């Protein structure tokens, strides 16, 4: 920790560079914004508020490409979370966040506090969190370090979420070498509220109180936002102090107190915001900026759990379980009493002021006096260079890779043991998916489904991201990411409403990485417009590199859908013997980036085939109509491993089997053409189903009594015992996790 250097020493020693500011930014702050040298505390404030994590200075120009409005959207990007109207004066609130860098350094706390932070975003909007999801990407399970990271991250997510009493109902876990040194830990939370309870993160009304509530402030997490905006080095031990430590029991109390305040005492409250990245400085500045007001804080009043904390440390701390409130003058004691009933501190630390200045007092001195806008609105945005990676240019000229297989059965057996495809039960069982007793469908299905109490409705939710596809073709891969999420939602019988995202990429200063970001957002934005799923919230996590090696560009899409009648929820597993099986969508030679390509070649190469998104959207809409009419018994989307893996998964955990005859060669059984599903339909509903779906379906077989997978292809056929396939699928990951390296 640097001692309190003078402004001149900061300039001379270039300390600001260590804190993440560039030379150009520092000079701009001195010469254009302040007309003087910033002091130690002010330099710290600029360094975190101008970090990519807080300012989006690199990504903002391309994030503007996303659609973020339609008739259902009540709150888009810019607040703690997005909000969508679901009828009956209710709304769903959701958001996703990344905690990648902290989880690589201190995986348990990194993952746990990622969950805690996203939950605070939800209840800061006035909503009660009803479900959590995650999207986790690790290196291959072939070394002790990766196994340690996996176990600790899963334990951290489960430990925090279970203590909070919020079910973890869905998610994904994938494995690729590129994530070995920089795992991705993306957390998503979903909440429900009455529309009359919606809150804003704003501090307006001259003389109104700024109140600090929750846990005391310590030295944990200082410069966490800067840490999240930089590349990794080998020596991660030195970065542990930037990782926060969570207390879920404190957060549970904080959540209940905040919900009581927002639901029952709105007349006391002006605004509320989570203290997340960059702690007090970020929450207070953002609340002032949104209200176009000033703020004056006395840092001596901030509850502190460590002695001798400087203004710099107090402002930059990312201690968990804290919120900032703007309370109407005269109601300070009311709020104090409410939080005391939950054994929580609530302290007035400042006031909303006239004008636009941000003033901080500490130990009798003014340690900061700058315009709010310099921290929030005047960030120096520089256009980024873009360059098409050579691998993309090379791939354009290559022939489509089509594998040569000797045995469909042996290939299926091998694919079911690929870690990305294999059962994740040993991890998901760590999570409580049934707490609150509203879970209709939990982990292991296409989407998690939560009943909305007091109504017939339910919400379906999913997280999906495939970095391999974006790596091979960012624009097409971006479209596939959104479509995969929508397919999962529709497969559950739900209408897709909107998305949140976590955009996990490498160093944006690399022109090739920035090109990947830009092109993939183009693809995602096109898909969002076509599917009418606006982006209502999200998160950008850049600098995901380890010693100069970037991860695959990985866009995680979190999507929520509405089921009008919970009794029309469609399961992912076959239900009735004799039901007809249909393949929805057409199958092509889509093997590049697939699990099959990785299995056979141990690497992914080539380009992706583009596809007709309008056509896919048209038949997905028709499929949803059939589901809402109760014509579909079960449905499962086709993703990793293609049709072969999906057919097997549909009978796992059941006592039934499947018999199909396919007009395709064995290789196509494992193609990963996007936008496809397998559905089962009872014989009574076949005529109505076929009339609605028309030419977009192919009858392929039926559900049978025998507990077997019986597949006939044009050049191969096999019968496999479901119990044997399921054993391979279930034991693959436990076996890898136990193996000696």
Swiss-Prot record:
SUPFAM superfamilies: PurM C-terminal domain-like, PurM N-terminal domain-like. Substrate binds at residues 98-101, 120, 244, 318-320, 541. Pathway: Purine metabolism; IMP biosynthesis via de novo pathway; 5-amino-1-(5-phospho-D-ribosyl)imidazole from N(2)-formyl-N(1)-(5-phospho-D-ribosyl)glycinamide: step 1/2. Keywords: ATP-binding, Cytoplasm, Ligase, Magnesium, Metal-binding, Nucleotide-binding, Purine biosynthesis. It holds the Pfam family AIRS. Mg(2+) 1 binds at residues 97, 539. GO terms for molecular function: ATP binding; magnesium ion binding; phosphoribosylformylglycinamidine synthase activity. Its main location: cytoplasm. It is an enzyme of class 6 (ligase). Mg(2+) 2 binds at residues 121, 274. Its EC number is 6.3.5.3. ATP binds at residues 56, 95, 501, 538. InterPro entries: PRibForGlyAmidine_synth_PurL, PurL_linker, PurM-like_C_dom, PurM-like_C_sf, PurM-like_N, PurM-like_N_sf. It comes from the Bacteria. It is found in: Cytoplasm. The active site is at 53, 99 (proton acceptor). It catalyses: N(2)-formyl-N(1)-(5-phospho-beta-D-ribosyl)glycinamide + L-glutamine + ATP + H2O = 2-formamido-N(1)-(5-O-phospho-beta-D-ribosyl)acetamidine + L-glutamate + ADP + phosphate + H(+). GO terms for cellular component: cytoplasm. GO terms for biological process: 'de novo' IMP biosynthetic process. HAMAP family: PurL_2. Belongs to the FGAMS family. Part of the phosphoribosylformylglycinamidine synthase complex involved in the purines biosynthetic pathway. Catalyzes the ATP-dependent conversion of formylglycinamide ribonucleotide (FGAR) and glutamine to yield formylglycinamidine ribonucleotide (FGAM) and glutamate. The FGAM synthase complex is composed of three subunits. PurQ produces an ammonia molecule by converting glutamine to glutamate. PurL transfers the ammonia molecule to FGAR to form FGAM in an ATP-dependent manner. Monomer. Part of the FGAM synthase complex composed of 1 PurL, 1 PurQ and 2 PurS subunits. This is Phosphoribosylformylglycinamidine synthase subunit PurL. The lineage of its organism: Bacteria, Bacillati, Bacillota, Bacilli, Lactobacillales.
